[in-house]
Amino acid sequence: MDAQYNPRTVEEVFRDFKGRRAGLVRALTADVEDFFRQCDPEKENLCLYGFPNEHWEVNLPAEEVPPELPEPALGINFARDGMQEKDWLSMVAVHSDAWLLSVAFYFGARFGFDKNDRKRLFGMINDLPTIFEVVSGKSKAKPPSANNHSNSKSKSSNKTKSSEPRAKQPKPQPQPPVKNEGREEEGGPDDEEGGGGGGGGGREEEHGETLCGACGESYGADEFWICCDICEKWFHGKCVKITPAKAEHIKQYKCPSCSGGNGGGGGVSGNGKRARPS
C-alpha cells in the first residue's frame, strides 16, 4: 500500500524494516485497545499494516493482483473473539514478524542484493527482538543470550589457550603415571630389565635431547610421544601406531622391541594391535 517507497541499499531496507516494525509494535502494545476495536470480526478480511514512518493501519488487502509488495496475514479480525486476547495478539505478532521479513527480502531480491548483502541485512534484523518477543514479554531474554554468546567465545578461547601449553610439553602428562603403574605390576624382574634399558634414555635426557627409539628423530613440540615401560625409551606415537586416545586405555606400554614380536615387530599389551617396524 506504500509501493512508491522503494529502499535500494541494505541500510535503507533496514531503516524501512525498523519503521514498519515500530508501527506494528505500537499497534500491539501502546495502541492495543484501538487495534483491538478496529479488528471487528463482523467486518471483511482485515490486515495489519506497518509503514516506514512508524505508523500502523488495519485495512482491507490491496486490490491489485498480484500486489506490489507482499501482503500481511489476511483475516486477523475473524479470530479475535474466539481466542484469549493474549493468544490472539501473539498470533498477530508472529504473522507480522513473517511479513516484515518477506518485505525486507522482497526489496533485497528486487534490487539485486548479493549473498553478503543478504547476510548483513539478516544480521542487522536479527539483532532486534521480534515483535512476538516484545508482545509476549520474552524480549528481556535477548541481552543474556548475547552475553552467553560472548561467554561461549571466551570459554572457547580459554580452551584454546589452555590446550597450547599441553601441546608444547616435552612429554605427555598421562604417560609417567602409566609407566610407574606398569613397573609396580611387573615387579622386581621387570624393574631390573627396565633399569638396564633405561640408562640410554636417561643419558639422552641429561644431554637435553630426546630421540625417538624408532626413527631416531628428536622431539617436536607439537608431536605426541609415548614411553616404553620396559626399556624406558621414548617413541613418536605415529612411529609405533599409538594415538593419545589409545594410550589412555593402555595399562603398560611395551615398544615393538620389548613386546617379543616376530623379528622386532611390536605389540601393545592389552589390545593386540601390531605396530609396523620402522
UniProtKB/Swiss-Prot annotation:
Disulfide bonds: none annotated. GO terms for biological process: chromatin organization; regulation of DNA-templated transcription. A zinc finger (PHD-type) spans 209-261. GO terms for molecular function: histone binding; transcription cis-regulatory region binding; transcription coregulator activity; zinc ion binding. The keyword Metal-binding applies. Residues 138-207, 259-278 are annotated as: Disordered. Belongs to the Alfin family. The record marks 219, 225, 229, 234 as: Histone H3K4me3 binding. It comes from Oryza sativa subsp. japonica. Interacts with H3K4me3 and to a lesser extent with H3K4me2. This is PHD finger protein ALFIN-LIKE 9. Its main location: nucleus. It comes from the Eukaryota. GO terms for cellular component: nucleus. It is found in: Nucleus. Histone-binding component that specifically recognizes H3 tails trimethylated on 'Lys-4' (H3K4me3), which mark transcription start sites of virtually all active genes. CDD domains: PHD_AL_plant. The PHD-type zinc finger mediates the binding to H3K4me3. InterPro entries: Alfin (IPR045104), Alfin_N (IPR021998), PHD_AL_plant (IPR044104), Zinc_finger_PHD-type_CS (IPR019786), Znf_FYVE_PHD (IPR011011), Znf_PHD (IPR001965), Znf_PHD-finger (IPR019787), Znf_RING/FYVE/PHD (IPR013083). The keyword Transmembrane helix does not apply.
